A protein has these predicted regions:
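Glycine- and small/polar-enriched repetitive beta-structure motifs of secreted/surface proteins
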Residues: 1-181
Length: 181
């Protein structure tokens, strides 16, 4: 390999590194497919596990950012928690804090924020969503630019042209399932 300043600790950690540099990878199979990415930090079993080329990601927790691997243009993501952003594939500028936050859909959108257990869990292609609170915006799967703050805020929103909604407070917006409200 020609990469510089890499640190890998754990079974299979950083095992495919070629030209990547400045990566710190700790955990079994963490960053094991990382080849050319730079400035990544991963801590936990399979954190950044299938990532190969993107850069400037931080993944802390079991399977956090585990499936990000499809695009060199993805990166600048932060995930902290059990399976946080585990299904993120080509997303960029994503922040996931909490167990399974932004962790259920194959996320390709940009600028999504999920804070809390399963916050924004099913977001797939939507961009610029903000979900803060236990299961806030949990079933949203597309579109974007929604703001859900509070436990279960906009948690049933999931189909159709469902963008530009704002809900603040416990269980706020439960009746919003589709459409712009």
């Amino acid at each position: 390999t020609t990469g510089n300043n890499n640190t890998g600790l754990g079974y299979g950690a950083l095992s495919d590194a070629t030209t990547g540099a400045n990566n710190t990878i700790i955990g079994a199979l963490a960053g094991d497919a990382l080849t050319t990415g730079i400035d990544n930090v991963a801590l936990g079993y399979t954190a950044l596990g299938v990532e190969d080329t993107s850069s400037r990601n931080t993944a802390v927790g079991f399977e956090s950012l585990a499936n990000q691997n499809l695009s060199a243009s993805s990166g600048y993501n932060a995930a902290l928690g059990y399976q946080a952003a585990a299904s993120l594939t080509t997303g960029i500028y994503t922040v996931a804090l909490g167990g399974r936050a932004l962790g259920g859909g194959a996320i390709t959108g940009a600028g999504n924020i999920g804070i809390g257990y399963k916050a924004g869990y099913a977001i797939t292609s939507g961009a610029d969503n903000v979900a803060i609170g236990h299961q806030a915006l949990m079933t949203e799967d597309g579109d974007g630019r929604n703001v859900a703050i509070g436990t279960s805020a906009l948690t049933n929103q999931n189909a159709g042209a469902d963008a530009y909604n704002v809900a603040v407070g416990y269980d706020t917006g439960l009746s919003v399932t589709t459409g712009i409200k």
